């Protein structure tokens, strides 16, 4: 008596045939805020507090008359508090960035809007603090004052402006002509005209210009990454939320931010089939710092 034939078993679906779930954020907005946004913001608040004690301030500012600022800058305890706050803030910001990156790299959090919110929250406390790590922003302001006075900044240094030292200009660059382009000098002139004889207010307005560059980066980098087959969230996390970017471009208020932001925006719109606008934006970036013009031929390659 023969055995019954085995029942037909349908072949298993190959893993490649299985539907791939769309990546979604692995936690709620509240979880995201508690895990990354709030700790990073506390970090930049501490950095801003530290900047009151060890950041660059011009001699000609009423902020030095504030008793808290005076204590942070003129006493041993104040110096210790300022340095401790700065170091603790940087460590906390770095930790928050790395934790966020862990989620992004695992694909747990790919929501660009969340990353933009984290960036805005981390930057906010740095908007009003004294410049850190560089006082170039006061040289920008002085060069704007040169323009207002009708002095050619390509032949004369910031020392040609009366009171340049009290304005916070670094003596190392006081005699040097400007290395920057016409577009940046026009912006600096506008800031100097608007703020008048108030170098710290001028520095804060200059910071708005550099933050505009960071905003352009945050918009452009994900688009460039998408066209290159890279996850936009990973590119945004690595290229814009990086603490080095926040320290140099926001806390340091360095005009490299505007140059790089314009160039990145130019590349992004070129990839979106707007090459003429791309050329204009990259050219403006080169008119902030002439080294940016090196990027112009790459628009042609993308075109």
Predicted feature residues:
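Aromatic- and kink-enriched transmembrane "portal" helix at the membrane-lumen/periplasm boundary
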Residues: 199, 203, 214-217, 237-259, ...
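Specific aromatic-rich, kink-prone transmembrane helix
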Residues: 216-220, 259-274
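Perimembrane helix-loop-helix junctions
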Residues: 294-303
């Amino acid at each position: 008596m023969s055995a019954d034939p085995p029942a037909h078993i349908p072949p298993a679906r190959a893993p490649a045939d299985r539907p791939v779930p769309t990546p979604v954020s692995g936690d709620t907005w509240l979880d995201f805020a508690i895990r990354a946004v709030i700790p990073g913001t506390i970090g930049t608040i501490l950095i801003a507090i530290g900047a009151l004690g060890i950041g660059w301030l011009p001699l000609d500012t009423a902020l030095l008359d504030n008793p808290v600022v005076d204590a942070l800058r003129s006493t041993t305890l104040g110096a210790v508090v300022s340095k401790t706050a700065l170091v603790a803030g940087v460590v906390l910001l770095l930790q928050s960035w790395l934790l966020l990156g862990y989620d992004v790299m695992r694909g747990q959090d790919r929501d660009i809007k969340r990353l933009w919110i984290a960036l805005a929250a981390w930057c906010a406390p740095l908007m009003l603090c004294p410049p850190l790590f560089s006082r170039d922003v006061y040289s920008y302001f002085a060069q704007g004052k040169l323009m207002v006075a009708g002095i050619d900044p390509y032949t004369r240094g910031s020392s040609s402006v009366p009171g340049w030292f009290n304005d916070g200009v670094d003596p190392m660059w006081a005699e040097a002509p400007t290395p920057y382009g016409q577009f940046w000098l026009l912006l600096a002139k506008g800031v100097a005209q608007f703020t008048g004889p108030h170098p710290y207010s001028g520095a804060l307005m200059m910071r708005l210009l550099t933050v505009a560059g960071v905003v352009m980066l945050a918009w452009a980098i994900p688009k460039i990454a998408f066209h290159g087959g890279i996850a936009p969230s990973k590119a945004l996390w690595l290229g814009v939320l990086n603490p080095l970017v926040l320290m140099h471009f926001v806390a340091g208020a360095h005009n490299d931010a505007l140059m790089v932001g314009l160039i990145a925006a130019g590349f992004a719109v070129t990839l979106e089939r707007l090459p003429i606008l791309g050329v204009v934006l990259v050219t403006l970036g080169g008119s902030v710092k002439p080294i940016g013009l090196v990027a112009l031929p790459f628009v042609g390659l993308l075109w």
